[in-house]
């Protein structure tokens, strides 16, 4: 193969690889799984709830999240943030309700799978956490923070609990 053809082929491979690697990033952007991640929405109640969560004021964040939920009851991200806030307040039943609703709406929701897994660990159910780790493994083709965080939490749990 001549040098110009080889260079052209290498360029094509690099472009294809770059496109292939950008697909998971584009897909992940739709899933607002972290309470600290900036939302694409301009909803002032959701923005205020996120600020409150970042400052650990979970109780007050609930007020704003419930307002958003009234307007958008099928928003998996809002259910995830409600579950997160309730979990941080040790209100386990309410946390499960909202995590499960987020997962009903969007079974592959990264944050809800991570956080419900962490909640299962808190309740001494590592096998249930492993189920959600498997979902994250399937969803995160090239790895993601949610998978890494839950995997580490399971590892820590097993180290401390045999």
Per-range role (PLM):
Residues 40-71:
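Alpha-helical segment of the N-proximal tetratricopeptide repeat
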Residues 71, 105, 138-142:
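Structural marker of alpha-solenoid helical repeat scaffolds
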